[in-house]
Amino acid sequence: MKRIFRLFVLAMMATAVAVSCNDKEDYVEPTLDVTPNNIAGCWSLDSWSGGELSSCSYVYIDFVRADKTYTLYQNIDSQYMRAITGHYFIYTDDEKGAIIRGNYDYGNGDWSHRYVVTELTEGRMVWTALDNPADVSVYIRATLPSDLQ
């Protein structure tokens, strides 16, 4: 009887080890709520509407949680770096989810789109233009290069 019990315990342990070592399941990073706290910090535009940025182009956006401001560092529309500042606002739409919008300082108006923010993790977020679902931007967590500061 003891032998049968030992064999049963060994079989259960082997089953537990086999199940716990299953590498087929990929780790899925948990998503975060879209809040000023969770998006605070520096992000780099990784792709835009499915395409990569050219090797000499960049977009960094640095969100400040405390006063809901941002600084956008980019050279998309110029050969030189431009620093653009403003305020951002996050609200929740019952159907679409978290939406971010913003305006530019010095009376330069609002962002051209409002964006639905999805797939926010510690290191990545996806923005989709509310009025143009084909306009998709993927941002990754980044450190602002010292030459841009």
Functional labels for PLM-detected ranges:
Residues 1-19:
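Sec-dependent bacterial lipoprotein signal peptides
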Residues 15-40, 146-149:
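Bacterial Sec-dependent N-terminal signal peptides
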Residues 34-54, 88-90:
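Tryptophan-anchored aromatic micro-motifs
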Residues 47, 71-75, 99-105, 125-130:
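Short beta-strand segments that buttress and anchor functional surface loops
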Residues 54-99:
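N-terminal glycine/threonine-rich, aromatic-flanked beta-hairpin/loop signature
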Residues 83-93, 128-149:
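Edge beta-strand at a domain terminus
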Residues 94-118:
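An anionic, turn-rich surface loop/hairpin at beta-sheet edges
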